[in-house]
Each structure stands twice: as C-alpha cells, then as structure tokens.
Design a protein with these regions (language model features):
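Alpha-helical transmembrane segments of integral membrane proteins
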Residues: 1-193
C-alpha cells in the first residue's frame, strides 16, 4: 500500500513541479480534494465501492497516501529546481528526462524514504481499522484488526485475546515511527551539520 502511494505521489509531485503552471495547479487541486477527506472515511468509501479483500484494502490505503507523497515530492522538486547546478544543466541542453532521472529523483529519494517509513505505521493502523470494521482482511486471513474484533466479545473473561494483538499493533507502529526518525537523522543533510 505504501509503495502504491509512494510511486503515485512521486510521479504526480515531480510532474507537477517540473511542468508547473496549469498542470501543477490541476494536479495539486486534485491532491487537495483527496486530502480534504479524513483518511478512514475515504478508506471506508473506497472499500465499500471496491469490495472487501486485502488487495482492495491495499489499493485504498495506497490511494490515501498519494497526496502526502505528491506534496512532499513537489516541494523537494521545486527546491532542487532553484539550485544553480540544475539551471546550468538546463543551459547546456540536458534533456528533461535526464534531468528528472539524474538530478531531481536522487534528491527526492531521501525525504520520500523517510516519509515511507512513517507511512508504514499509518498503513498498519489503517489496515487494522478496516479489518476491525469488517472491510479489510476477512477471516481466516490473519489481521490484528480481526483479532482485536474477535476478542471484543470476550474482553471481560479473557482480555488477552484482544490485548495481545493490540500490543503487537502498538509495538509495530512504534517501531516504524522510530525507524522513520532514524532514517530522517541519517538521510537529512541539514540535521547532520
């Protein structure tokens, strides 16, 4: 799901920043429309229209992540476009595709990877929420949301049925957030100074 959002958002963000003008305006307004919906509501709407399966849940979660990655990529691309080495490359006639692949994309890579690490934790939470509501993974497919939902009926007699997957979910999300912070410290050159 994160790969879908990362790929789609990176393509849209670089396209919007590189071409600018009307294309930039249209793509970013489309991203603003997607951003205007709460993530869980948009996921429920997409799951209701696509049907309940783990693949559809991945697609819905991926669509939710596209605007965030698009905005991040657009901002980094616009920053790179103002650099003198890129202006020099344009002046000597370097093609647009070479500029994107050799100059812009490597500079976008660091922030996008950090965002992806944090997005993994949110994707796990969204999938668990959808499965808890009965819209994500369906039994007997394993999902922490399904396990928490199953244990809900036995919470007074056997709280560990819901507590164990809840703690596993917490540890997974916490771990991905720590990983994202570590990657940011490693890949952000401004913090290394």
């Amino acid at each position: 799901a994160v790969a879908i959002g990362m790929t789609g958002g990176t393509v849209i963000g670089i396209t919007a920043a590189y071409f600018g003008g009307l294309i930039d305006n249209l793509l970013m307004r489309l991203m603003d429309i997607l951003f205007s919906f709460p993530a869980i509501l948009l996921a429920v709407i997409l799951m209701a229209s696509l049907g309940t399966s783990i693949l559809n849940a991945m697609l819905a979660i991926g669509i939710i992540f596209i605007p965030g990655f698009a905005r991040l990529t657009r901002a980094v691309t616009q920053t790179v476009q103002r650099q003198q080495y890129l202006e020099a490359a344009i002046c000597i006639g370097v093609s647009g595709s070479r500029l994107i692949w050799r100059e812009i994309l490597p500079n976008v890579f660091g922030p996008v990877v950090v965002e992806a690490a944090v997005a993994f934790s949110y994707a796990v939470l969204l999938e668990s929420a959808l499965s808890f509501l009965g819209l994500g993974a369906q039994p007997p497919e394993p999902s922490w949301g399904n396990m928490i939902n199953t244990g809900r009926g036995f919470i007074e007699q056997a709280p560990w049925i819901s507590l164990a997957p809840g703690m596993a979910l917490f540890l997974c999300v916490f771990s991905f957030n720590i990983l994202g912070d570590g990657l940011r410290d490693l890949l952000d050159p401004k913090l290394n100074k």
